[in-house]
């Protein structure tokens, strides 16, 4: 058996790849002068003249197609008779070609009868198995690549690559809204930072993310992401194209002055939070694709810690302000658990740790009670109520008659009486005590809880005017929380820092904001000596007039919380 490769068109790669098996196929060849020769069987040792290449190809094609039609199942095959009817037809056509000039057509017609008789000797002109293998080689290679990627989808859960640079406490402090800072301003800074980090990590492995290797934008668990164009039409695009759309849209959005303002006179639009949610959701899609399809390359480059930290940053921000739908983040929930960003049940770990902290502090109740009595004697406080109070700080403890309550995310009612006047979400405390009056600019914020769920209530702490006047009298020293309890404040205040600077709480130092949106300037009002003081109040409200012990800080802390002058 000999093997030959048919070259039907000369430029068709698929045609050259068809393997033909034959035993003795009579092929007509032509010499340089155009005269026909006797049919010969080509072998590996018989070279073919280059001048007769086209004639040989056409003759072999005719013989190959005629012979192959006899072996295709289900097709009617014309029966050969003794008179050689098929050969006669070939002779008739060959005669016409010979009358025109006696070229290769005549030679083909002259040998038509012999070719028809020799066609019966063709055993199997088309090896189906080899041809199918040739055609499907590329598809099988792609299938093997897909199987390899599917086995590596959980590579990011290996213990050796579960590394990140910051512990949980630092991540929590990273996303907590600073007191006095606008919520949109804080959200804009984190959105810009996450966009830059995701773009940098993807840029390191972008050459591995190709149209052929990543034909679809996929995530863990065979999650597929479709792109929605400006008209809302779903489009199935490759991963590189999808990520290019994401980065282009994000860059165009953050560069828009009307959406991300950088000048003092410009304000954030009312729909800014929804725009930021969309940007963060698209960035999460890119992170999910990096974990699902390119984590091996990222780990080999030693960039897995950076990717884990970026994911932890986005997850902490989402858990703090509830920015992404849970259906989107479910694909990487196992990674959240592995990185200890959340527990298996999806509950709030901070509330549990806060509750245990309250029980631990109850063992030292006698010592704290003595300190409380000393502070009451020093400030002449007369409040001895037995109402319940919520203790969240390490130095906060109620009296012997009060009952400690654990933190709960369902304490705030959506129909609370107190109106929202600040931008700090609060889910672990009441909104406003009944007997409070003379509101300052203090922000009530539970910095020990990171879960808010769907709660969007905003609360403020209340400090009576008498407490503010007492703060002015001591000249910048901190006031203990017992004063607030004695004056019907009703809040377990922590870190009360007051100063005599009167800048209307307008220019707080934005140290946490590296993108200088809305740089505020201080305004002097020296002529008006008001009794209004700026300060940072970070506490948890408590019902009634329960006594709570606060940590008094003075001097440097009070100066740090004061406003700056131009």
UniProtKB/Swiss-Prot annotation:
Amino-acid positions noted as binding Zn(2+) in the UniProt annotation, renumbered to this chain: 209, 214, 289, 294
Stretches with biased composition (Low complexity): 35-57, 367-388, 498-507
Disordered, as annotated region: 28-57, 74-118, 346-407, 498-541
Keyword Transferase: no
One CC-aspect GO term: nucleus
Compartments in which it is found: Cytoplasm; Nucleus
Compositional bias ranges of the Polar residues kind: 394-407
Keywords for the protein's UniProt record, in alphabetical order: Cytoplasm, Metal-binding, Nucleus, Zinc
GO biological process: cell morphogenesis; long-term memory; negative regulation of synaptic assembly at neuromuscular junction; rhabdomere development; signal transduction
Feature: compositional bias, Gly residues: 85-115
Pfam families: Mob1_phocein (PF03637)
Protein name: MOB kinase activator-like 2
Gene: Mob2
